[in-house]
Amino acid sequence: MLRIGIGGPVGSGKTALTEALVPLLIEAGRTPGVITNDIYTQEDAHHVRRELAGILDPERVMGVETGSCPHTAVRDDPTMNLAVGAEMLERFPDIDTLIYESGGDNLTLTFSPALADVFVFVLDTAEGEKMPRKRGPGITDSDILVINKIDIAQYVRTDLNVMESDAHRVRENRPVVLTNSLTGFGVDELHQQIMSQWNGARTELIG
């Protein structure tokens, strides 16, 4: 079972990235389910169902209303997410990949190892090129850092080269992927990185 955790600030493009990633997982022969997190609603779950209509069974998308800070539900006490994940697997035992999308949060967000095997943290260029230099566990400790919305960098006066270079520096050259989730640019690379990270971790456990 591959469990992917996707986190990042509000509006960074986590939901769009999830929606772009699911078809690639299916094309690669995997059977995904999606669990979204919102504080008070299931808006992201509704959005994923609409956008992936005809691609992913809408019943394989479930929402968690956390009622608390997003990081609490995916790091400090992931009980609600674990319960929803167990429910989904009971209903659909063929699922071999779960994507947990966190609600929007700050740079301290991380995922509990009990919930995610591969942790993807998403920034976007509209937040400014300085964001990687702010560090925070989401930026420095995630398995993969995504810099999303590269298409608007020039319009928000973000030097993409600086942002990418700083990201590699503070992460000590751990994976950084540039994406435009609306066009799909970079999402294939993200998919490959996720599988590489997961397969590497499994090899270490077996070894």
Predicted regions and their residues:
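Nucleotide-state-sensitive switch-loop elements of NTP-binding domains
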Residues: 1-116, 128-130
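Short, surface-exposed connector motifs at secondary-structure boundaries
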Residues: 26-32, 145, 172-175
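Structural signal for conserved beta-strand scaffold positions within catalytic alpha/beta enzyme cores
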Residues: 63-65, 121, 178
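Short acidic active-site motifs
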Residues: 107, 134, 186
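Inter-motif core of Ras-like GTPase G domains
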Residues: 110-126, 135-147
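Canonical P-loop GTPase G-domain recognition
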Residues: 152-207
